[in-house]
Amino acid sequence: MLSLVLLGLVCLSCSTEKDYNLSPRANFDALWHELDVGYCYFQEKLPADSTWEMMHQKYLPRISEGMSSYELFDVLSALMMELKDGHVTLYSSFDTKAYDEWRASYPSNVDRQVRFRYLGSAYRIARSLVYAPIEYNEHQKDSVGLIYYSSFSNVVGHNNINAVLQSFQNCRGVIIDIRDNGGGSLSNAFTLASHFAEKETLVGYTSYKTGPGHCEFSSPKSTILKPTKYGILWKKPVVVLTNRGVYSAANDFALFMKQLPQVTLLGDTTGGGGGLPRGSELPNGWRLRYSGSKTMDPEGNQVEFGIPPDIKVSLKESDIEKGKDTLIEEAIKVIVEKSKSTP
């Protein structure tokens, strides 16, 4: 499972004064070796005709003892980018590098200005949740609730969620917009999702790296989503809006919600990010983060490359020009249709 916050919970191998070493070759070898023994997606990420050892041979000729720190950083970054993993990140005092093509190479399917038009000027903010009802039937005053959650790095508590859902008690359903939510704390994903689970639900499995071999993993451990014990349990229809910008803990939230019967994922396949980040420190003090576990859905499928929506919908330019959000409009239709059969 994914969370930037959990990075602080894993064991970091830190450089001591005795270990401190500015040698480009020493740092190149340290980064390559750390990933070699700890990274979890070699089989999924590298082409069939390539190996991690071949990557070492490919980039070693670019290492020289007279190179600058900037040049070394660029070579190490290029080596890491071969893994095409958004969680693989290198941090120095002068730069940070992470792979971002999981999002950048795809349509965004979101227009922020149009999204806030639906929230209107009277929206409220419950800590990290921006919310407002949307009236879609002017004569009958029917409405659905819209929740926008920008980042799971922003804390959300049960009291906040209860306040939002209480305000939507007369709505036919709820839309949760997590488009471009790049993740954050996994605990926030569990907290929010727990208010929509009527019973304990298997939402996936996690396998942890247990040894230096590329295939050494623990047996899959079940991940169970439990209903909240702290307030409102929402049973009406829910639509979660997704795009390629949904990553890491937000990807997990999409995975959790997809397993619930009253929930529909609508939009585009998420960006993925199914590995729990681990961290270490290079001899020169630069920090390295990478995926150290694998997350699977209840059927055993990897979620590293994203979670497909139940209903694929793309944002139309013609709708944007009219001030409309194609995904929100379709989500309203789904909720209206589902609410007809909801007690």
Question: Which residues does each predicted region cover?
Answer:
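Conserved acidic, small-residue-rich alpha-beta core segments centered on
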Residues: 187-322, 329
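C-terminal alpha-helix
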Residues: 330-338
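Short acidic (Asp/Glu) and glycine-rich catalytic loops that position anionic groups and cofactors
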Residues: 10-12, 172, 309-311
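Flexible, low-complexity junctional segments that flank or bridge functional domains
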Residues: 14-208, 214-222, 237, 279, ...
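Structural motif
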Residues: 6, 139, 166, 230-233
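Short, contiguous clusters of charged residues that form electrostatic/catalytic patches at enzyme active sites
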Residues: 159-162, 326-330
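Sec-dependent bacterial lipoprotein signal peptides
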Residues: 1-12
